[in-house]
């Protein structure tokens, strides 16, 4: 598994092209699987289940339609994105459901390292925390699979400007809010977070 970490924001359309090409390379066995850590410039994306009324304004940031599962979400500075391109065929026990659950376990264990108690909710796909008596999402999931190879992935709010979510109903869920590591009192940079992400990934995906 190769790891690629970007130091500058990656334009969304370029990231999509890169992932599609990488999936083909993995399928053809000419390129290795990849975990790609990056951030985007501020934007909204609409998954395959997004409804027009969940986009409250299109004047804040660019809006991209994407083939991943899910509804509307936000990407931008302070949010660590992990795009995982993995060949499920190469893992006898790893079906789609187990893959998504293992992604959840990965993020939960990463956050635990920073003393954040969280949980993966399979019904409201994502990783959640209980903050001041209310449930809030700290990590969103959006997955696509082609030729049994995964792409897209997970976005974790590290020091995200949460006001940027105001233009959408995040993931189509009105009842619950959004939070970040910074809001929870954990002030870290990507470099520290990435080290833990890689360490925990290698642990949880050893059985997938």
Curated annotation (Swiss-Prot):
Transferase among keywords: yes
Domain BPL/LPL catalytic: residue ranges: 29-208
Pfam families: LplA-B_cat (PF21948)
Pathway(s) annotated for this protein in UniProt: Protein modification; protein lipoylation via endogenous pathway; protein N(6)-(lipoyl)lysine from octanoyl-[acyl-carrier-protein]: step 1/2
GO-annotated cellular components: cytoplasm
InterPro entries recorded: aa-tRNA-synth_II/BPL/LPL (IPR045864), BPL_LPL_catalytic (IPR004143), Octanoyltransferase (IPR000544), Octanoyltransferase_CS (IPR020605)
Catalysed reaction, written as an equation: octanoyl-[ACP] + L-lysyl-[protein] = N(6)-octanoyl-L-lysyl-[protein] + holo-[ACP] + H(+)
MF terms in GO: lipoyl(octanoyl) transferase activity
Cytoplasm among keywords: yes
Site feature location: Lowers pKa of active site Cys: 137
Enzyme class label: transferase
Keyword annotations from UniProtKB, A to Z: Acyltransferase, Cytoplasm, Transferase
EC number: 2.3.1.181
GO terms (BP aspect): protein modification process
Active-site residues per Swiss-Prot or TrEMBL entry: 171 (acyl-thioester intermediate)
Compartmental location: Cytoplasm
Residues that coordinate or bind substrate: 68-75, 140-142, 153-155
Protein purpose: Catalyzes the transfer of endogenously produced octanoic acid from octanoyl-acyl-carrier-protein onto the lipoyl domains of lipoate-dependent enzymes. Lipoyl-ACP can also act as a substrate although octanoyl-ACP is likely to be the physiological substrate.
Family: Belongs to the LipB family.
Additional note from the record: In the reaction, the free carboxyl group of octanoic acid is attached via an amide linkage to the epsilon-amino group of a specific lysine residue of lipoyl domains of lipoate-dependent enzymes.
Protein name per its UniProtKB record: Octanoyltransferase
Species of origin: Ehrlichia ruminantium (strain Gardel)
Originating gene: lipB
């Amino acid at each position: 598994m190769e790891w690629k970490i970007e130091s500058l924001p990656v334009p969304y359309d370029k990231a999509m092209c890169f992932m599609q090409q990488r999936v083909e390379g993995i399928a053809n066995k000419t390129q290795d699987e990849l975990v790609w850590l990056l951030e985007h410039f501020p934007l909204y994306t609409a998954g395959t289940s997004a409804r027009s009324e969940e986009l409250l304004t299109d004047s804040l940031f660019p809006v991209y339609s994407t083939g991943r599962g899910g509804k509307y979400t936000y990407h931008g500075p302070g949010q660590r994105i992990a795009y995982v391109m993995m060949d499920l065929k190469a893992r006898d026990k790893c079906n789609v459901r187990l893959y998504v659950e293992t992604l959840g376990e990965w993020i939960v264990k990463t956050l635990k390292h920073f003393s954040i108690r969280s949980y993966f909710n399979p019904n409201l796909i994502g990783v959640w925390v209980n903050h001041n008596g209310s449930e809030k999402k700290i990590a969103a999931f959006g997955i696509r699979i082609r030729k049994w190879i995964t792409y897209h992935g997970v976005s974790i709010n590290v020091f995200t400007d949460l006001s940027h979510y105001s233009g959408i109903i995040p993931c189509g869920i009105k009842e619950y809010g959004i939070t970040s590591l910074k809001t929870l009192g954990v002030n870290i940079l990507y470099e520290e977070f990435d080290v833990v992400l890689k360490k925990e990934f290698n642990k949880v995906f050893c059985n997938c």
